[in-house]
Amino acid sequence: MSLMVIIMACVGFFLLQGAWPQEGVHRKPSFLALPGHLVKSEETVILQCWSDVMFEHFLLHREGKFNNTLHLIGEHHDGVSKANFSIGPMMPVLAGTYRCYGSVPHSPYQLSAPSDPLDMVIIGLYEKPSLSAQPGPTVQAGENVTLSCSSRSSYDMYHLSREGEAHERRLPAVRSINGTFQADFPLGPATHGGTYRCFGSFRDAPYEWSNSSDPLLVSVTGNPSNSWPSPTEPSSKTGNPRHLHVLIGTSVVKIPFTILLFFLLHRWCSDKKNAAVMDQEPAGNRTVNSEDSDEQDHQEVSYA
């Protein structure tokens, strides 16, 4: 492989690295759904990505759909940059987990860290379940309360929402002795009331939910505090995202290629310089006449 081929390969590597998006250069933007992430069929929802970093562009990405990335130019107002992505009319193919990213001017391939995930759910596709409270919807402060969501439809999962809370609790459905599919949500000792609803979903379509149950108002008498324990996990996972920040990795890969490219260029320049010096030497200095050659051969024979 010639020197120029190696150099061109190194240059090509750097060009490819420059064209590949790099995540994690800036901190993550905020991400929310307006009016909310539970959307009825055929309705439209706005996904808003915003940050106090002056991003020039925002990207919207749906998990598992690499060809469905949307780009918008950011709007700048009062020290905040934002973009509003209109999603709709809502249908099952649009449901899923979304994230957004930001990029600054002159660096379109250097993306921010991903926002927290946002689950967009389409509701109203199946019949509504029933929601009840045990021992009842009105309880004394400190009394244990359980909310039961049930239906004759063979739902695999139930989701319990409370007005004012961003995330739902979820539990798998269990078939009861009376033939219904049920999930019991233990709320623990009652400290604060609220309005609850539940939804059902199937295992093979986790973002497609039933109609909402009728709202259930739970009232607490006595001396309630400001919150109710949340013994079950929320349906949205807001931990560390699965996206790997590749900026460090690509930098580590670039270092040896930079050294190699410098070495090859230095060697190539040295070879060119030596060749130029050789071309400038007098012809007499580079030739040996026949007499000198014969004399050297004779001396070599004499010393042998």
UniProtKB/Swiss-Prot annotation:
Enumerate the UniProt keywords alphabetically: Cell membrane, Disulfide bond, Glycoprotein, Immunoglobulin domain, Membrane, Receptor, Repeat, Signal, Transmembrane, Transmembrane helix
- Stretches assigned to the Cytoplasmic side: 266-304
Signal peptide range: 1-21
Residue ranges, annotated region (Disordered): 220-239, 280-304
Which SUPFAM superfamilies does the protein's record reference?
Immunoglobulin
Assembly description? Interacts with HLA-F; this interaction is direct.
Q: What is this protein called?
A: Killer cell immunoglobulin-like receptor 2DS4
Which organism's genome codes for this protein?
Homo sapiens
